[in-house]
Amino acid sequence: MDKQPATSWSIHTRPEIIAKYEIFERVGSGAYADVYRARRLSDGLIVALKEIFDYQSAFREIDALTILNGSPNVVVMHEYFWREEENAVLVLEFLRSDLAAVIRDGKRKKKVEGGDGFSVGEIKRWMIQILTGVDACHRNLIVHRDLKPGNMLISDDGVLKLADFGQARILMEHDIVASDENQQAYKLEDKDGETSEPPEVIPDYENSPRQGSDGQEREAMSKDEYFRQVEELKAKQVVRDDTDKDSNVHDGDISCLATCTVSEMDDDLGRNSFSYDADEAVDDTQGLMTSCVGTRWFRPPELLYGSTMYGLEVDLWSLGCVFAELLSLEPLFPGISDIDQISRVTNVLGNLNEEVWPGCVDLPDYKSISFAKVESPLGIEGCLPNHSGDVISLLKKLICYDPASRATTMEMLNDKYLSEEPLPVPVSELYVPPTMSGPDEDSPRKWNDYREMDSDSDFDGFGPMNVKPTSSGFTIEFP
């Protein structure tokens, strides 16, 4: 199959689709995909039809959702249509709300009614569902790479499901996506014949066997074992496709019901002047990946500094940012540019150096930019002053410079915070707003104000700077 985006044409002209689905209004549109609400003619089920114009995003999303079929906290793909010279069309379950809408509603309630926005029990239940979904990805060595509230969809009965896998990367080989150009539709069945609901109790991940998409049980993996396996995968050069050779922001700027929301990345499509050139950096024969993925506010330091050798840990940082936003109803690091993003992280965690992250000096952009020493970092506790020590301790396990120090999803699910009083509320007691977040509402803090700034330069707003030539280019120092 040609790996160039197919010519876009209306989904209404596809006979194999209109024979099975009654297509209603378009509910989302972007540069690389359109989403329609539709009804399955055989049983009246309301679904979302996602037509993807970009080969890379389509391949990734189909591959990941096929592997994760049956995971209770991952969006369901019922089937998909994909032929030579045609756009892929995914048939997804229709979910009308997302976590960004929940956070926005919580912020409104806090302003009108006072209080904290969410109860501790509500936050715990949301986090358990998020962690369970990400754990399913990581058990199958799938890196989502764009975790944020707008990509966490919610059913009417409170079940949260991860969505928008257009930037996902699979760190192991799967032969999932069919390549027969004569075949029109590929149907997926749930493993047990129906969609399972998430458990009302916290899963015992330490003692339960791990199960992959093939149904085979796997032993629980320690953190050391995980890192060993990832290094082996990199050494064996099993990252098989070349889809990271382009900037992977395709689904980041699309607003779609049941799939994704408008991203803050739309002013950041190009790489800034100090960033590692991912187009030149990515060498699939060496198992490298692009650093230009994910939404900036949730992007970890290793990506901000241009790393192309990373793993599941990038999702763990993003999880920490989502957790912090649930707690405070504000984004933790709402950077207006990549430099501003690094600056905000530095002001909270302190300067990045070998002491806090051994090996950080080898990051592609580490020597290209530096900030004055932060004498008194704000710290996570400074960002969330009204929260308990247990909450701060949990966040610090995710929001830390060294990727190897971040807690895995398994460790997070077994943390005492999630099992002690006050207990997580039942899923049925979670309030779900009737609609999902609209454009530019993925995180609530005045994003439109940021976008109205006169210049999109990463260097504006920082005052004086020192640019020094070096043998390999230049460095930028901010006082």
UniProtKB/Swiss-Prot annotation:
One GO cellular component, as annotated: nucleus
Residues bound to ATP: 27-35, 50
Compositionally biased tracts (Basic and acidic residues): 442-454
Key word Cell cycle present: yes
EC number: 2.7.11.22, 2.7.11.23
Composition skew (Polar residues), residue ranges: 468-479
InterPro entries named in the record: CDK, Kinase-like_dom_sf, Prot_kinase_dom, Protein_kinase_ATP_BS, Ser/Thr_kinase_AS
Keyword match Cell wall biogenesis/degradation: no
Modified residue annotations for Phosphothreonine: 290
GO biological process: cell division; maintenance of root meristem identity; protein phosphorylation; regulation of cyclin-dependent protein serine/threonine kinase activity
All copies of domain Protein kinase, residue ranges: 21-418
Tissue specificity annotation: Highly expressed in suspension cell culture. Expressed at low levels in all plant organs.
Catalysed reactions, semicolon-separated: L-seryl-[protein] + ATP = O-phospho-L-seryl-[protein] + ADP + H(+); L-threonyl-[protein] + ATP = O-phospho-L-threonyl-[protein] + ADP + H(+); [DNA-directed RNA polymerase] + ATP = phospho-[DNA-directed RNA polymerase] + ADP + H(+)
Region: Disordered, residue numbers: 187-221, 434-479
Family: Belongs to the protein kinase superfamily. CMGC Ser/Thr protein kinase family. CDC2/CDKX subfamily.
PANTHER family listed in its UniProt record: CELL DIVISION PROTEIN KINASE (PTHR24056), CYCLIN-DEPENDENT KINASE 20 (PTHR24056:SF171)
Role this protein plays: CDK-activating kinase that modulates CDKD-2 and CDKD-3 activities by phosphorylation of the T-loop. Activates CDKD-2 C-terminal domain (CTD) kinase activity. Activates CDKA-1 probably by phosphorylation. Possesses a CDK kinase activity independently of association with cyclin CYCH1-1. Phosphorylates the CTD of the large subunit of RNA polymerase II.
Protein name per UniProt: Cyclin-dependent kinase F-1
Organism annotation: Arabidopsis thaliana
